[in-house]
Amino acid sequence: MIKKIGVLTSGGDAPGMNAAIRGVVRSALTEGLEVMGIYDGYLGLYEDRMVQLDRYSVSDMINRGGTFLGSARFPEFRDENIRAVAIENLKKRGIDALVVIGGDGSYMGAMRLTEMGFPCIGLPGTIDNDIKGTDYTIGFFTALSTVVEAIDRLRDTSSSHQRISVVEVMGRYCGDLTLAAAIAGGCEFVVVPEVEFSREDLVNEIKAGIAKGKKHAIVAITEHMCDVDELAHFIEKETGRETRATVLGHIQRGGSPVPYDRILASRMGAYAIDLLLAGYGGRCVGIQNEQLVHHDIIDAIENMKRPFKGDWLDCAKKLY
């Protein structure tokens, strides 16, 4: 029977992580469980840096961006001997189960601990929206709001100078954030990793827009696809229109979470405790069709496919 749990945040931070921690902590305490917060993700777990959390530990946290427990990259956690030390630290503290909030790398760590016999529940916390088994991740909608605000501001100056703007959006190898921002921001063109990209085809589309009388344009592109400064120079050379690149960078990860992310994080945090009390371990939580769901974390990582939002792309193209 579970009496004490641990909670950590891992990988890149996302708005709503604090709300998720709060959801875990307060739900666990309501059910009579003790909660230990683990600093700096798997690194802190390995180094045995933990703190007892109570209701007041998470007061005034639901509106704060980032993660008050901290996060860190710790690739050494792939080493089974490192994980064995981590499990020993958990057992030494009397911790019976672990809630991990983070992205796919964090899920991998939780999966490895599960394979070694320690029960874990994964909550999807990343702005990239690239986690299998869930429609949306904690932080996605806040990042979307940040990106759209930036695009709106760029549109003001681009229209004033009849300029083309290339905006690089986070997402790693998932185009969801770029696609959503392109639709909500009214971008004229969108480039995502799920679809083959040609600079020449993009330029031809831009030229076609200019021929129709378009005075300015915004191109939204997912990071890692190309050097956006070089792309901007290429567009300017081929079209004769002044073109500038803007890399939004880590500003997309910050800020107070929007209400949807606060609600999603709170629901998922509480649901994680429900699962643990029901005897589940080695699960990852998601939301599908607005219903909370859970999947075997090993099956989710190794076998589940994440569908591309092709209908979003079709919509964006119709609105060019």
Swiss-Prot record:
Pathway: Carbohydrate degradation; glycolysis; D-glyceraldehyde 3-phosphate and glycerone phosphate from D-glucose: step 3/4. Homotetramer. The gene is pfkA. It catalyses: beta-D-fructose 6-phosphate + ATP = beta-D-fructose 1,6-bisphosphate + ADP + H(+); D-sedoheptulose 7-phosphate + ATP = D-sedoheptulose 1,7-bisphosphate + ADP + H(+). Belongs to the phosphofructokinase type A (PFKA) family. ATP-dependent PFK group I subfamily. Prokaryotic clade 'B1' sub-subfamily. Its EC number is 2.7.1.11. The keyword Thylakoid does not apply. ADP binds at residues 22-26, 55-60, 155, 186-188, 212, 214-216. Keywords: Allosteric enzyme, ATP-binding, Cytoplasm, Glycolysis, Kinase, Magnesium, Metal-binding, Nucleotide-binding, Transferase. GO terms for molecular function: 6-phosphofructokinase activity; ATP binding; fructose-6-phosphate binding; GDP binding; identical protein binding; magnesium ion binding; ribonucleotide binding. The keyword Transmembrane helix does not apply. Changing D128S: 18000-fold reduction of catalytic rate. Mg(2+) binds at D104. ATP binds at G12, R73, F74, G103, D104, G105, S106. Substrate binds at T126, I127, D128, R163, M170, G171, R172, E223, R244, H250, I251, Q252, R253. Signal peptide: none annotated. This is ATP-dependent 6-phosphofructokinase isozyme 1. It comes from Escherichia coli (strain K12).
